[in-house]
């Protein structure tokens, strides 16, 4: 009797961990923010729309800080490097990016839960579903299509070791720096690194 190849076991585990919260997120997204539609599926991912319009204007040589979105009339308020990092959003249908963005936020959420000690496998999947349904900041981040959960995952990955003892691939501080160039708020953790004596990570 042969054992299941490790990559197959890992794929099944990821499916159990990610698919339930992703499916629940997709189901509730049209109802989180006003003017969403359950069918055809059209959530009001307002912030994601801002990112897409800003990137398209950047590639067209326009001022991204003058970019506004239709109906909501919102502006891009992130550092310019954030628009550069979001360049792929200019290509492909918006519906595709709504799904990809939601999947990315769910992956980030599950990564944080795992590093905070939630057991892997179906328990992580169920906790992820509960977080999507019950934790308002996570739910609205998904509904607006914001970047906050991804930035949180970067910072947490810098601060907390992997629960399974996975070796750190990047020097401590790199992911916090990346989060800070996308949105300035995570820069507070640079100060935190200084305060706990990790000056190298802060720099």
Language model regions located:
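Perimembrane helix-loop-helix junctions
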Residues: 2-6, 187-203
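TM-lumen/periplasm interface segments of multi-pass membrane proteins
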Residues: 9-122, 140
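Membrane-embedded alpha-helical segments of multi-pass membrane proteins
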Residues: 100-108, 149-154, 179-185
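Membrane-interface helix-boundary motifs at transmembrane edges
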Residues: 114-123, 164-167, 193-201
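Short helix- or helix-capping micro-motifs
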Residues: 127-133, 176, 180
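Short acidic/glycine- and proline-prone juxtamembrane loop motifs at membrane-interface regions
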Residues: 140-148
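Membrane-interface transmembrane helices that cradle and orient dolichyl/undecaprenyl
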Residues: 150, 155-170
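Membrane-interface alpha helices of multi-pass inner-membrane proteins
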Residues: 169-194
